[in-house]
Swiss-Prot record:
This is Interleukin-12 receptor subunit beta-2. Belongs to the type I cytokine receptor family. Type 2 subfamily. CDD domains: FN3 (cd00063). Keywords: Disulfide bond, Glycoprotein, Membrane, Phosphoprotein, Receptor, Repeat, Signal, Transmembrane, Transmembrane helix. Lps-defective mice C57BL/10ScCr (Cr) mice carry a mutation in the IL12RB2 gene leading to the production of a truncated IL12 receptor beta 2 chain resulting in malfunction of the IL12-mediated IFN-gamma response. GO terms for biological process: interleukin-12-mediated signaling pathway; positive regulation of type II interferon production; response to cytokine; response to lipopolysaccharide. Changing Y778F: No loss of IL12-induced STAT4 activation nor T-cell proliferation. No effect on IFN-gamma production. Heterodimer/heterooligomer; disulfide-linked. The functional high affinity IL12 receptor is composed of I12RB1 and IL12RB2. Il12RB2 binds JAK2 (via its N-terminal) through a membrane-proximal region of the cytoplasmic domain. GO terms for cellular component: external side of plasma membrane; plasma membrane. Residues 659-874 are cytoplasmic. Residues 139-237, 242-335, 336-430, 438-530, 536-635 form the Fibronectin type-III domain. Receptor for interleukin-12. This subunit is the signaling component coupling to the JAK2/STAT4 pathway. Promotes the proliferation of T-cells as well as NK cells. Induces the promotion of T-cells towards the Th1 phenotype by strongly enhancing IFN-gamma production. Can also activate STAT3. A motif (Box 1 motif) lies at residues 677-685.
Amino acid sequence: MAQTVRECSLALLFLFMWLLIKANIDVCKLGTVTVQPAPVIPLGSAANISCSLNPKQGCSHYPSSNELILLKFVNDVLVENLHGKKVHDHTGHSSTFQVTNLSLGMTLFVCKLNCSNSQKKPPVPVCGVEISVGVAPEPPQNISCVQEGENGTVACSWNSGKVTYLKTNYTLQLSGPNNLTCQKQCFSDNRQNCNRLDLGINLSPDLAESRFIVRVTAINDLGNSSSLPHTFTFLDIVIPLPPWDIRINFLNASGSRGTLQWEDEGQVVLNQLRYQPLNSTSWNMVNATNAKGKYDLRDLRPFTEYEFQISSKLHLSGGSWSNWSESLRTRTPEEEPVGILDIWYMKQDIDYDRQQISLFWKSLNPSEARGKILHYQVTLQEVTKKTTLQNTTRHTSWTRVIPRTGAWTASVSAANSKGASAPTHINIVDLCGTGLLAPHQVSAKSENMDNILVTWQPPKKADSAVREYIVEWRALQPGSITKFPPHWLRIPPDNMSALISENIKPYICYEIRVHALSESQGGCSSIRGDSKHKAPVSGPHITAITEKKERLFISWTHIPFPEQRGCILHYRIYWKERDSTAQPELCEIQYRRSQNSHPISSLQPRVTYVLWMTAVTAAGESPQGNEREFCPQGKANWKAFVISSICIAIITVGTFSIRYFRQKAFTLLSTLKPQWYSRTIPDPANSTWVKKYPILEEKIQLPTDNLLMAWPTPEEPEPLIIHEVLYHMIPVVRQPYYFKRGQGFQGYSTSKQDAMYIANPQATGTLTAETRQLVNLYKVLESRDPDSKLANLTSPLTVTPVNYLPSHEGYLPSNIEDLSPHEADPTDSFDLEHQHISLSIFASSSLRPLIFGGERLTLDRLKMGYDSLMSNEA
């Protein structure tokens, strides 16, 4: 903008000074400025500029102090405030200065008079002069002349050569037969260029064989030059007008045949046609001789938009082609499709007897579709049962649920307004059912931003069994399979690689499968790949931490699809103790889309941990996700509990197997009985046995059969142990009593453990036979199970009435107080004392005998003897 303003200012200044100089007005009344040798000089020449004051002009107060200043104004010098550049000064009435190295173009020099040394009064202009620097014109070259159409005029153009920087006049002269002469002029300067002139004359076809000569002459102040003569004929310069009114007709609505028609000048004998589909970059060229405005085209594509253009020529071998006509754009009619659809499918089991079949197919290309595809006809057929499912859809996919049994085939055809294509058939097999057909060593490598190179090795099964390979890929993003359908390529069986580029975008992870198909089987291998990757933007979000069976289960949500930035290889779970500065521990998990939880078993119970997760791609690790705190509660170690319990049990059993420790323990426990606890001693008068049999005065007759009954019965209270106390300790054998019917009482053996001592007030030697048979004693009744029986007795049993008192340990004789302490063996007394220690944990002093009101049966009133038993038995 600033440069434009400066150029405009300089132009105005030049114009103003030029007008002043040309008009010879008051600006030059003080003097004159001249230039020698001329105002126009060639490049590299010098010029002398003289500035002279007129008589009686100059500084009136100080005539001797006339200072003449020469200023230079050029287009390429920045002149502030239009003051110019000072190139010379001189004191006097005249001054001459030689200028050199002037640039091409016009340069203005102005002479000024300065009468004061003060800066307040500016110098006064005296006069100025222009000096133009340029070059002589070069001879014009490359002259060509044309006449557009039969009724056009002749126009010629040429190359002027180098710019002269001066005003240069050009003259075009034409001469021909019959003294034909014509010329035109134009000039070139800094504002316009002259390199073409229209002579304004028309050459008729009558002069077709005549020759014409043209010449161009250039003249300026530094010289002149002329071009070489240029000779031509009518056919050489006349160019037909472009054809017009172009149209096309299709024969019988055919999409491949059409007749192109146009209008042309009458003298045209040759036409050139070119046409192409709009999406093409190359033209189909056709030459038509004497076409008379019509030509048949037979190789057009149906339902394709074409562009047509035509050019004309007046002579088969000479002359020039006309310009191309305006374009005609039109679409050819439809025809029935000729292509075969490329079909693929996916299987998914729904339950034990149903499966979902999803069919996919690629659209036909325009050359195969040959029209607008209106719909697709889909057929799914079960071979053995002849079950057929048909449907019509406008989409390129179709899904149907069918039984899992039977062999199925699918076919798809495309239809437009003219017809349908041949159906494409495919057998529905288990694509990944045969492991022997699975390709090996499948790899996916990024080639650039838009494609992925997939390579593999042939399956274990013979290569001849593989009919073709299918490379299938699908973006691993949320959405239905119809919204994001798979893409696939068919690869010949001898190729082991494929470059996939269809719908491949950077920073998106794709699941890639390589299928090897035979006639009736299939095997597949899969891998994930991307064309470009970065570290994920964020980490997985931990949603829950649960504790089960001494393990923590970490649950998370996957990273949103746009933030994954490629294929995720691993998830990492980090944990460390809260407020710990140590490096965290980690667990790396192989990424699987279906997995959203993982167990950890290395955390200590009752310790608070901080956990977080990250994701890893081939480019790096993501930032950490959210942090979660968790304190495992742990679980009691049942193994340690069982082992410790067994050890305690063994120690306890071993300790209580020793009699001394067992007695001490029982004694300690018996002291712990509370005073409110009293063990009730049952009264024999209330027993079932007494109620069943009447009480006699001296004895009770018992049938011996009744002795075989279980005693005591379940209804009776728990039997108590009764200690027998005698004045003289007599060993008595104690064992379970059992006697059979008809055998009476048998002898029994005596053991040390069962020995007791009987207190007898009489001397042993003074006992009579009856007395010895009826020893009055109290038998010690031990606690038995209800199933216990009486053992055989070898001596008669006699019970004599004796006064007694209830005790805590059993029934004692009434004369126990008469027992002398020295008559009892201390050792035996100790053994007797500890044989019947109570197992109660309460103090024995708290026991009280049960007191009944009224008359009751006591042992003093009972007398039982062997004779009575035998008599009852009889």
